[in-house]
């Protein structure tokens, strides 16, 4: 990964943290949330962290831990900019076969969704207002919707409509669907179960990734899925123990169960994005399989009477596997 992407992500996260600290210091003692409708968690906390009703940031750990979503979002946006620059310099053929790399707008869509989640969830945990809660819950969905949009883009043509200038990029239509879905989920937030919607999206994402591995075996790095599943399971465990008040820390600790939920689910979203980004083109995949077959063939022929042919086959297999990497 380019160093500039790391600098972009961590530099942006640091700036966001400084902005929150400066804003909180500027309104300290002024009651910035007065006049806002209180959320249920202000008087009846749903999480174990201590609530400070008179402070600009009413729950510290649960607020600042949302920077993790912003870091993931900034990484995705940074990679989108890097992919766009690389395509301009080296040509679009360098990313042939990888939908995410070839379509920087999809990375930007996912990145902006994570940034929106970090902002909305941070606003809720800082304010504990009803409006903040509505944004927080609705913002949970766009990152998963964006990942589903990436999978859909892989199965659809790059452009939709008539040939020529009249056609529309598929990514633009998918982005519009994600935005409209987010608006609808925000609009009807109070009339639906957030647990049901989120569980449905997670299940849909799981089915889609399994289908990708069945349709295109070997073209994705499945290890990212394993990491994502472990991180999600750990995040759920931390969240549930926090709600049950069984997480082994005090209410003033920065290591809260719900804060770890933010950190771990942000990391899980990052691994799912990297899984979608790990796609290899069909041609490269075929050549890697050919190299593996030549390697196996050379091992079987090591004891044959023609060592030169075995050595040539082994060298050819090594060359193809080096091209793969």
How would you describe each model-predicted region?
Residues 282-299:
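Long, intrinsically disordered low-complexity tandem-repeat segments
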Residues 290, 322-323:
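Long, compositionally biased, helix-prone stretches
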Residues 94, 282, 292, 309-312:
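Ala/Thr-enriched low-complexity intrinsically disordered regions
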Residues 2-280, 323-324:
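Multi-pass alpha-helical transmembrane bundles in non-GPCR membrane proteins
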Residues 301-304, 324:
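Arg/Gly-rich low-complexity intrinsically disordered repeat tracts
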């Amino acid at each position: 990964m380019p160093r500039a992407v790391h600098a972009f992500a961590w530099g942006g996260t640091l700036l966001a943290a400084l902005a929150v600290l400066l804003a909180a210091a500027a309104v300290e003692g002024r009651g910035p949330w007065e006049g806002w409708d209180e959320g249920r968690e202000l008087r009846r906390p749903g999480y174990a962290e201590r609530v400070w009703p008179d402070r600009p940031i009413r729950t510290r750990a649960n607020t600042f831990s949302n920077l993790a979503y912003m870091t993931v979002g900034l990484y995705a946006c940074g990679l989108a900019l890097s992919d766009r620059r690389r395509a301009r310099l080296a040509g679009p053929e360098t990313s042939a076969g990888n939908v995410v790399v070839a379509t920087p707008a999809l990375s930007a869509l996912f990145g902006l969704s994570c940034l929106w989640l970090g902002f909305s969830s941070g606003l809720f945990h800082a304010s504990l207002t009803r409006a903040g809660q509505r944004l927080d819950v609705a913002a949970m969905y766009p990152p998963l919707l964006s990942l589903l949009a990436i999978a859909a883009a892989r199965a659809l043509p790059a452009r939709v409509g008539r040939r020529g200038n009249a056609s529309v990029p598929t990514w633009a239509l998918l982005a519009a669907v994600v935005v409209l879905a987010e608006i609808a989920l925000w609009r009807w937030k109070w009339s639906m179960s957030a647990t049901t919607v989120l569980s449905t999206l997670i299940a849909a994402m799981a089915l889609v990734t399994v289908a990708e591995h069945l349709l295109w075996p070997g073209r994705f790095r499945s290890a990212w899925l394993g990491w994502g599943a472990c991180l999600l399971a750990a995040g759920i465990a931390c969240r549930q123990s926090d709600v049950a008040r069984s997480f082994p820390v005090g209410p003033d600790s920065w290591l809260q169960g719900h804060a770890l939920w933010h950190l771990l689910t942000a990391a899980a979203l990052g691994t799912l994005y990297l899984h979608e980004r790990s796609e290899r083109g069909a041609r490269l995949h075929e050549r890697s399989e050919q190299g593996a077959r030549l390697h196996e063939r050379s091992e079987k022929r090591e004891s044959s009477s023609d060592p030169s042919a075995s050595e040539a086959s082994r060298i050819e297999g090594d060359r193809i596997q080096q091209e793969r990497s």
